[in-house]
Amino acid sequence: MPIVPKHFFERPTLELAEKLLGKIFVRRISDTIRLKGRIVETEAYCGEFDEASHAWRGKTTRNSMMFNSPGMLYVYLAYGSHYMLNIVSEPENIPGAVLIRAMEPIDGLMFMKEQRGTALATSLLSGPGKLTQAFAIRGDCNGKDLFNNEFFLENAQDIPQNAMGSGSRVGITKSRQLQWRKYILNNPHVSKARGS
């Protein structure tokens, strides 16, 4: 499959949250281990006018990656225990990022199961903390991009609007009315939050 180019990510965050659905996230662990997951659920965080966004109060050392080049990885530790994988959106210096909330495992399931300690395919990547654990994504991945041999996206057909659902974002206390969580309808790998 063709690799998704950099200009793909340089678009409004909410649009990117939809366009990422169906794309294949790839991490190359070694010459013999390649992990692949189809993105089935995302959340948009739209910068300085979104109270739930890390960038709402402006640029800081912690959130500076949200202001970086589109297609960069913004990885941070949430609740002191789970890493969150985000893909930077928008032109550089305009803050925005899309949280990858769930994936459908495609390749490298044995490695993923070892990382997660579970054999059930539908729960391997069905949450943001689960998928970072399965893909061995930690804080040292923050600032890497999707244009190298370790991380990249493979292109796939866009998900049509009638096959896409929207809902409120999970685990936030502000801007909860915004329907900025996007997911593929009827996909069993979407997180349990799909019904909200």
Curated annotation (Swiss-Prot):
Organism: Chlorobium phaeobacteroides (strain DSM 266 / SMG 266 / 2430)
UniProt entry keywords in alphabetical sequence: DNA damage, DNA repair, Hydrolase
Record carries keyword DNA damage: yes
A UniProt-annotated Pfam family: Pur_DNA_glyco
Name by which UniProt lists this protein: Putative 3-methyladenine DNA glycosylase
Protein family per UniProt: Belongs to the DNA glycosylase MPG family.
InterPro entries, alphabetized: Formyl_transferase-like_C_sf, MPG, MPG_sf
Disulfide bonds: none
GO biological process: base-excision repair
GO molecular function terms noted in the UniProt entry: alkylbase DNA N-glycosylase activity; DNA binding
Signal peptide residue numbers: none
